[in-house]
Regions:
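Acidic/polar-rich alpha-helix caps and helix-coil junctions
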Residues: 1-130, 151-435
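Alpha-helix boundary/N-cap detector
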Residues: 135-139, 192
Length: 435
């Protein structure tokens, strides 16, 4: 996959990066054949995995009471459990479980009512509690925006969002009604951006006013929730250990972890490196890129995207959906302002990229995907934004805030340098381009 991708396949940015014989380290002519071989390898890997029992994970496989869950929670739990359920049916290759204890502590929002800040034991106890659920791994506002609408298309393409003014007013607020009670706390005021999103949005992210299934409460009518404003339980209450963006990485926190004011139980799990959903998306991408011409997208590309989307609740008959939105052609034709996008190779390239960003969000793939696509110079040079987490009331909290302006990501940053000591040991080594 890496060899076929733009970074290493016909990348003329590195035309002058050559060996001692003057030959480019990176081939200068694009080869479609590399994508053909990648597609063949992905298909072989899929067949091997499925033959040996791998299948897309469904939380009903492990949660004895999942059949009683409302659809909103069931499908959001599918994406959470795909990552955190130990040795589940989708896992192909993982790292050891060591480290996921700390990962979960640093990702978990403090959803247990802590003692009020004060003097003596009250302050100490509250601080300890917050250290068990620090929430410092903070997804960005851009991450929140990249998830689809409930119609399975990008929010900046969704005709319902555009014509109603919802997209332009997505940073304004509205009150949660009982219609959204499984995703957000009824009566809470939160951003318009948080309404009418796909299940993976609610399964991957916690935010001010969002419900948090499990972790001590599984009664769907009395769920934990995030109280993320300044001075509140999930927010900046102690001056440390809080999300600087206002978002939390719910996806990587196992739902059976239990945190109270006096104790903590965290179930470690092997963190996925490659899972079947990832492999399906690799295959769809490779098959699309291997196709000659711009209007001959193979049917299998749509088939494998459908598998991933439908597992996530993007399908007819779920959450009141009347259209077959598992098929991106149907979703875009019905709901997008760019209805022909899935019919072209270039359009499908864009769709597959976003599908990977959504499906694999918070799993450590996006940085390297952006590198191999040669999109990092644009995407990783953007300002990091979030909500104003120093705000105590809605009017102050829901203000988009620039938290960090990174230096520009340039051509040299796609490849890392060889350290000076190694160059001194072997004088025939050639330093990486730009360093």
């Amino acid at each position: 996959l890496w060899a076929a991708s733009p970074l290493f396949n016909g990348n003329k940015d590195y035309a002058n990066f050559r060996n001692e014989e003057g030959k480019p380290f990176i081939n200068q002519e694009f080869s479609r054949e590399k994508w053909v071989r990648t597609a063949e390898a992905c298909k072989e890997a899929i067949e091997s995995a499925e033959t040996n029992g791998c299948q897309l994970y469904d939380c009903s496989m492990d949660m004895s009471y999942s059949q009683d869950l409302p659809e909103e929670i069931f499908y959001s739990m599918n994406i959470r459990q795909t990552v955190t359920e130990r040795f589940n049916s989708e896992l192909i290759w993982s790292v050891g479980k060591q480290g996921t204890n700390e990962l979960q502590n640093l990702s978990m929002a403090c959803i247990v009512p802590s003692l009020q800040q004060g003097s003596g034991n009250g302050q100490v106890t509250g601080s300890i509690l917050q250290s068990r659920a620090a929430g410092v791994y903070a997804p960005t506002l851009e991450t929140a925006e990249q998830f689809y609408s409930k119609n399975g298309v990008p929010i900046d393409e969704d005709k319902e969002w555009l014509t109603s003014g919802k997209y332009d007013n997505r940073y304004t607020t509205r009150q949660v009604t009982s219609a959204d009670k499984y995703n957000m706390r009824t009566g809470w005021t939160t951003a318009v951006l948080h309404f009418n999103r796909e299940p993976r949005f609610y399964g991957s992210l916690g935010f001010d006013g969002s419900t948090w299934y499990g972790n001590g409460r599984t009664d769907v009518n009395d769920l934990n929730y995030v109280d993320g404003k300044y001075g509140r339980n999930s927010g900046n209450k102690w001056g440390f250990n809080y999300s600087i963006t206002g978002y939390f990485a719910k996806k990587v926190v196992y739902y059976q972890n239990a945190i109270t004011q006096s104790s903590q139980v965290v179930y470690e799990y092997p963190f996925p490196i490659i899972r079947l959903g990832d492999l399906y998306l690799m295959y769809a991408e490779s098959l699309n890129e291997a196709t000659e011409g711009d209007n001959n997208v193979p049917e299998e590309v749509y088939t494998y995207l459908r598998k991933v989307r439908e597992r996530s609740g993007l399908k007819k008959g779920v959450l009141g959906q009347t259209e077959d939105i598992g098929d991106v052609r149907v979703a875009w034709e019905k709901y997008s302002n760019d209805p022909t996008k899935p019919k072209t190779k270039d359009g499908m390239r864009s769709i597959i990229k976003q599908e990977r960003k959504i499906e694999l969000a918070l799993e450590g793939h996006q940085y390297n995907d952006l590198r191999r696509w040669k999109d990092a110079s644009k995407e990783l040079s953007k300002s990091i934004k979030g909500w104003n987490v120093q705000g105590e009331i809605e009017e102050d909290f829901y203000k988009v805030t620039t938290l960090f302006v990174p230096r520009a990501f340039t051509t040299k940053d796609y490849l890392w340098p060889i350290k000076k000591q190694d160059l001194q040991v072997d004088d025939k080594l050639i330093q990486t381009y730009g360093w």
